């Protein structure tokens, strides 16, 4: 692994920040590309010395020439593509969503083709699936049909299809990972970010209402980052999309964990009982057969780590109360 150099897009996002953190801690060189300038997620989980070891480049995945030049210039060997606009943003601006999420992904594969890089790990989504009633009861199997019901989900299906073409025509192996309900420090955007925001609110002594009820596959952000890194190092060959699984967890379980850790906040976290139109369980056995057992932080441990990190950022002044207010907005 000493000759590795990771190129990570979307590293100012939650999962990207955790990918960067893991790579820095193991001493692996990493170049990150992001169109945004905010580093508040990285500042939440990395100290200044650790951040200094990340090679930041401001850029747009929709610009193929720029992407290729950056990948070539840094000597990239391992690619983790996370840059994307999330579901609410794609709904608000489908044209921009397609440019970033589809064209941007094609550009990553094109750059890999031109530079003879033969492996990509990229973010897909459980949004590729249809509503719960479209599938039999139980965990959704690996080979279940895809019935996306949003622009965002359709873009992700397109990415998985294009990845398959790059495997068939150019021999580029790719693993598209479909996280479920990611939580943890830095998870402050997207449809399922409100459980993490509830943890931040508890740290600040503020009431908060989680925007959904029901049970879903909760996944701690650090675990998801580690799986992306492992996927980028696999010796498996082919192209496919894989669900990560996750621990089936209810919204009330999350609230109970928060209240257990911060008893004074009991009764201040509520939730909308309307469930999201997603299944709680996905069969990840095919992914496990390729990558081995996946990290799976227990809920209480993950919630505690999240609360501890946010409390520490307040105590050491790394993030101000104003910064955390922005997280809740």
Predicted regions and their residues:
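C-terminal substrate-binding subdomain of Rossmann-fold SDR/epimerase-dehydratase oxidoreductases
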Residues: 206, 211-214, 218-329
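N-terminal Rossmann NAD(P)H-binding glycine-rich loop of SDR-like oxidoreductase domains
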Residues: 6-26
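NAD(P)H-binding glycine-rich loop region in Rossmannoid oxidoreductase-like domains
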Residues: 58-100
């Amino acid at each position: 692994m000493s000759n590795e150099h990771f190129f990570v897009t979307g590293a100012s996002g939650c999962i990207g920040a955790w990918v960067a953190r893991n790579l820095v801690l193991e001493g692996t060189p990493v170049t990150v590309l992001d169109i945004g300038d905010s580093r508040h997620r990285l500042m939440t989980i990395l100290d200044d010395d650790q951040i200094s070891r990340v090679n930041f480049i401001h850029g747009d995945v929709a610009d193929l020439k720029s992407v290729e030049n950056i990948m070539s210039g840094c000597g990239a060997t391992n690619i983790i593509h996370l840059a994307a606009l999330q579901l609410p943003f794609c709904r608000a601006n489908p044209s921009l969503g397609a440019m970033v999420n589809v064209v941007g992904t094609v550009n990553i594969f094109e750059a890999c083709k031109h530079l003879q890089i033969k492996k990509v790990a990229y973010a897909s989504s459980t949004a590729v699936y249809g509503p719960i009633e479209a599938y039999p009861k139980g965990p959704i199997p690996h080979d279940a049909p895809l019935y996306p019901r949003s622009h965002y989900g359709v873009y992700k299906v397109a990415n998985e299809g294009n990845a398959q073409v790059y495997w068939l025509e150019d021999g580029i192996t790719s693993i598209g990972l479909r996280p479920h309900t990611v939580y943890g420090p830095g998870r402050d955007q997207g449809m399922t970010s409100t459980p993490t925001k509830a943890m931040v609110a508890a740290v600040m002594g503020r009431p908060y209402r989680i925007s959904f009820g029901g049970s879903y596959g909760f996944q701690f952000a650090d675990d998801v980052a580690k799986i992306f890194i492992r996927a980028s190092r696999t010796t498996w060959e082919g192209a496919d999309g894989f669900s990560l699984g996750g621990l089936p967890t209810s919204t009330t379980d999350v609230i109970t964990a928060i209240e257990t850790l911060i008893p004074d906040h009991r009764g201040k976290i509520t939730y909308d009982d309307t469930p999201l139109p997603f299944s709680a369980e996905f069969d990840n056995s095919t992914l496990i057969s390729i990558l081995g057992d996946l990290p799976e932080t227990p809920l209480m441990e993950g919630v505690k780590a999240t609360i501890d990190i946010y409390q520490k950022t307040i105590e050491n002044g790394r993030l101000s109360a104003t910064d955390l207010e922005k997280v809740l907005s």
